Each structure stands twice: as C-alpha cells, then as structure tokens.
C-alpha cells in the first residue's frame, strides 16, 4: 500500500515515495539506513551497510527485533544508497523471528532527492510520520543487549528535556569522545580534551526538538536539505534540554570490514552479503 507520495518540492502529506501500512499509524522508532558506507567498500558497493550480515542476519534486523520485543512495532526506515534493497527484503509487514510482525514505513531519500539528507535532515523529512516521542538509532550499530525500555521512554516523556541520548565508553576509533555527562544525568557540550563519551546513536526525541524555528527546516523538509544532527544536539545541551545515560553493554560501530569480520569471526560465512 502506498502512502501519500510526494515530489521533492512538496510536503510529505502530499505525494512521493513514502511507503507504509497506514498513514494514521505513527512510527515510534526510526532506523537510520541511508548512508553510503564509504569505509565499508567494496562490501557496500552492492549491499546497503545495514543489510550486511552479522551473526546470520542483517545488521539492522537486530535493532528491529529488539524494538518489537519492547512493544515498538511501528517503525520508519530512511534509505538512500541501494534503498530499494531494504524494502524488497523486509517489505511493509515482515514477520520477525520470535517477535512476530512489525509495521514499516519507508522514507526513500535517494529516490526523492538523489542523495541522503544526513541525520537531522532525514529525521525532519520523516517527522510527519513519527509519534510525539520516538526512538532513533543507526542501522549500522551492533548492540545486541540494548533494551528499548518503556520505563525510560515514559520517564523521558514526562520530563522537561527534548532529547535523551545514550553514551558509551570511547572505542579505539573515537578516543576523544563526543559529549560529556554530568552527575545529574545531563549531556554536556564540553570542549576537548574534556572527559567525554561517545554518542551511541541511540536516543529518544520529542518532536519539539526538531521544530522548524530550531532546525531552519519546515516540517517534512520538502526541499531536501541535508543537515547533521550534532550541531542541534550541542545547541540543545547548552540550553539544558538533553539528558543522558551511560550504556556499558556490548556496542560496536560496524564501520569497517575489519570490525564486521571481528563480529563474525566465529562464523566467517555470515559476513557475506545477502544474495
């Protein structure tokens, strides 16, 4: 079933390559899957990075199953590079192992604009189809034990903050970190070299975080502006609007073939792309 489709100069409620099971069902989670995966070449020449296999299934499917297990069955996936492969594999209503059926929407940035809109641009593009409070996570992260806690979401929803992010101890490829964390559980925009942690990409946001007065992009990003997320987060931290938690479980940014191989070394065959 096709959602209202939109051309690149119209609002998402008008008409484009938006696809989903229902216009009225808002997604409670967004999986970021639009990146090119430059450092993953040649593996990503024919396969979107979130679709590379980790321990026998597509990398992004680990998150989808965890979201569904936590009761988040309505998800939105943004795509650009080789995006049709993702929708072709999952469809609109896939039956995932152990967690059952989920409902998917797609924002095909590549088809609408010819390029990915970066994180903030992609979220604003999808905003009309996202719930008032929603999860966001990158499809190329492997964190099999992360819990999309209903309690965390409810506490955040009742808080004055506009975003809650999860930080992780700095991995070898990002030794300087990204953001600080106060004893009161607030994310801090600190100058380096402060004691910083790495942004995991896991986060909860309220729609107000992406208000057009803050982002400079109208609802639905009809012009296809590409915009990064970090400047918005830093500005919101300076306003005291971003809380944070430290996650110490297994977490890997699967950004290179070497890291993918390390995850799959117990069964190297699992690192092959999906046929």
Where in this protein do the model-derived segments appear?
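N-terminal glycine-rich phosphate-binding loop and ensuing alpha1 helix
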Residues: 2-6, 16-86, 148
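Residues at the starts of beta-strands that form the adenosine-phosphate
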Residues: 28, 73-75, 103, 162-163, ...
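Short acidic, glycine/proline-enriched helix-loop-strand junctions
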Residues: 29-30, 54, 87-104
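Conserved beta-loop-beta/alpha segment of the NTase-like Rossmann-fold superfamily
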Residues: 94-177, 182-183
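Catalytic-core segments of class I nucleotidyltransferases/pyrophosphorylases
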Residues: 134-135, 142, 146-157, 170-173, ...
């Amino acid at each position: 079933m096709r959602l209202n489709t939109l051309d690149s100069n119209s609002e998402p409620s008008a008409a484009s390559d938006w696809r989903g099971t229902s216009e009225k069902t808002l997604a409670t989670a967004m999986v970021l899957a639009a990146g090119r995966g430059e450092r993953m070449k040649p593996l990503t020449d024919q396969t979107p990075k979130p679709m590379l296999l980790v321990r026998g299934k597509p990398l992004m499917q680990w998150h989808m199953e965890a979201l569904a297990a936590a009761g988040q069955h309505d998800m939105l996936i943004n795509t650009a590079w080789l995006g049709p492969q993702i929708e072709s594999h999952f469809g609109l209503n896939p039956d995932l192992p152990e967690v059952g059926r989920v409902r998917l929407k797609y924002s095909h940035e590549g088809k609408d604009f010819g390029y990915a809109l970066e994180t903030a641009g992609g979220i604003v593009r999808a905003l009309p189809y996202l719930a008032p409070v929603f999860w966001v996570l990158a499809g190329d992260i492997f964190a099999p034990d992360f819990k999309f806690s209903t309690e965390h979401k409810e506490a955040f929803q009742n808080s004055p903050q506009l975003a809650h992010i999860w930080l992780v101890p700095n991995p070898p490829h990002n030794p300087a970190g990204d953001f600080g964390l106060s004893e009161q559980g607030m994310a801090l925009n600190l100058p380096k070299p402060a004691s910083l942690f790495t942004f995991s990409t896991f986060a909860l946001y309220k729609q107000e975080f992406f208000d057009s007065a803050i982002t400079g992009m109208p609802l639905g990003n009809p012009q296809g502006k590409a915009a990064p997320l970090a400047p918005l987060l830093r500005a919101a931290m300076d306003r005291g609007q971003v809380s944070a938690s430290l996650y110490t479980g297994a977490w890997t940014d699967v950004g290179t073939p070497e890291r993918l191989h390390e995850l799959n070394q117990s069964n190297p065959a699992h690192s092959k792309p999906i046929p």
